[in-house]
């Protein structure tokens, strides 16, 4: 029987082959509004929930090569009263790939094999919030909708013709898009009508309601915001102490 780790590795490659690497290629002319995410890097419970979501839904596909399990665990508060990393908890809940908590967060399938078999390897997401912005990422995560014309049966409101399945559909459910017609002008100034997405509405339920799912995606973005710049967390902590000292 194929192991869970191997299955995760295959899923990761499938996502990249069918276009998830489009994070680097996504269209820049976005007409759907970008939502504002209100994450808090000082909220360790949120960071821990986000880490759990990432490891269960994303880590089989995308590495976080600049972060080590033990360093991450210490930063987000998975430690005992003496500040020592709870390695057993990390191994049971977050580390499904490596044998050591001191290892960086990598995918199950080696990059060389992915490149040899498919010509491309899954993109690392360590810096996704810095390159795309956390608001863009949050909006992307909550904006999948049903589209029978697409290979995976879904599309994305801010990433038209997305090539990956909706990996979080079991949590969110499936949305449908309603459209509106607007008048725009072409490069010659000639007006024409164009259909764009007006809003997304939940068509079938998932394990979470909309409020719960949006909160979960805030946690996931919060975790990736931390990953993109781990020292930001320490600067925020120091900033609080400096302010208290000056008062």
Language-model features: locations:
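The canonical Cys-X-X-Cys-His
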Residues: 54-65, 220
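Bilobed periplasmic-binding protein/Venus flytrap-like ligand-binding cleft at the lobe interface
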Residues: 54, 140-147, 223-227
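Electrostatic cytochrome c docking/interface patches
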Residues: 28-52, 63-74, 228-236
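Post-cleavage N-terminal segment of exported redox proteins
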Residues: 2-41, 226-231, 247
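Short, aromatic-rich amphipathic segments at membrane interfaces
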Residues: 204-242
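Electron-transfer interface patches adjacent to heme c in soluble/periplasmic c-type cytochromes
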Residues: 77-157, 162-186, 194-213
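Extracytoplasmic/secreted proteins, especially bacterial periplasmic and envelope-associated proteins
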Residues: 45, 49, 53, 132, ...
């Amino acid at each position: 029987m194929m192991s869970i780790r191997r299955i995760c590795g295959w899923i990761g490659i499938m996502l990249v082959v069918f276009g998830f690497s489009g994070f680097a290629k996504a269209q820049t002319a976005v007409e759907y509004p970008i939502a504002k995410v209100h994450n808090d890097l000082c909220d360790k419970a949120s960071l821990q929930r986000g880490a759990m979501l990432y490891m269960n839904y994303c880590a089989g596909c995308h590495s976080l090569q600049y972060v080590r399990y033990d360093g991450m665990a210490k930063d987000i508060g998975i430690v005992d009263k003496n500040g020592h990393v709870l390695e057993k908890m990390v191994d049971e809940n977050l580390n499904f790939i490596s044998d050591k908590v001191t290892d960086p967060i990598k995918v199950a399938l080696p990059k060389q094999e992915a490149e040899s078999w498919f010509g491309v390897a899954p993109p690392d997401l360590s810096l996704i919030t810095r390159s795309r912005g956390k608001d863009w990422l949050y909006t992307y995560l909550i904006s999948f909708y049903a589209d029978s014309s697409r290979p995976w049966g879904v599309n994305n409101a801010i990433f038209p013709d997305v090539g990956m399945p909706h990996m979080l559909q079991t949590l969110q459910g499936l949305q449908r898009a309603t459209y509106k017609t607007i008048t725009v002008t072409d490069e010659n100034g000639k007006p024409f009508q164009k259909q764009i997405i007006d809003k997304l509405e939940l068509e079938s339920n998932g394990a979470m309601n909309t409020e719960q799912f949006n909160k979960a995606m805030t946690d996931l973005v919060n975790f990736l915001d931390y990953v993109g710049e781990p020292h930001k967390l320490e600067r925020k902590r120091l900033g609080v102490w400096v302010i208290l000292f000056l008062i």
